[in-house]
Regions:
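Fe(II)/2-oxoglutarate oxygenase catalytic core
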Residues: 1-101, 107, 113-175
Length: 175
């Protein structure tokens, strides 16, 4: 019974992830591991780490380029439990709303702070991007964002040129 509920929940989360334009545009998803639902109760934490380079899914290995945490519980339902991402000498703490997600390079050192009250419920997954290099992926994402923001403010010819550059870079940088 629990396995069936878990599989159904994981399927719903995977479908939501694939339907999210922001996630698709940022991650350039090739494939990803089925979401794993994680429950943290008081005194539970997950120490500093970077995620593994590969994740086994059934009989195949998926390269982990991007890690994704999907928040399943409202932040008011628990205390502590922040996802803390270490970016050089800066630290970013995230405690997202239910249904929100945070994506970050799997090479990033991060941790989950101790839950002090209530229950933290999240799903995690690992995305294999079509573009391995995070800097190239970020450049292409930024280029596409600028093109989308400019929209009809630029001439048709320049839109076509931007689309050509974007598609060419995507093709050149893809695995």
């Amino acid at each position: 019974q629990d396995d069936k509920a878990y599989l159904e929940s994981s399927k719903i989360l995977a479908e939501a992830l694939l339907a999210n334009e922001g996630v698709k545009n940022f991650a350039f998803i090739n494939r990803f591991a089925p979401p794993l639902i994680c429950r943290y109760q008081p005194d539970m934490a997950y120490g500093k780490h970077a995620d593994n380079a590969f994740v086994q899914v059934q009989n195949t290995m998926i390269r982990s380029d991007i890690s994704c945490t999907i928040f399943l519980e409202h932040p008011e339902a628990y205390e502590g439990g922040e996802l803390t991402i270490h970016l050089g000498d800066k630290t970013v703490s995230v405690k997202g709303k239910a249904g929100s997600a945070v994506l970050y390079p799997s090479t990033t050192i991060h941790e989950v702070m101790p839950v002090t009250k209530g229950e933290r419920l999240v799903a995690i997954t690992f995305i294999e991007s079509q573009i391995i290099d995070e800097h190239k992926r970020d450049l292409l994402y930024t280029l596409n964002e600028v093109a989308a923001l400019e929209g009809y403010n630029i001439s048709w010819d320049n839109r076509v040129r931007l689309q050509h550059v974007s598609a060419s870079l995507h093709r050149m940088w893809s695995t």
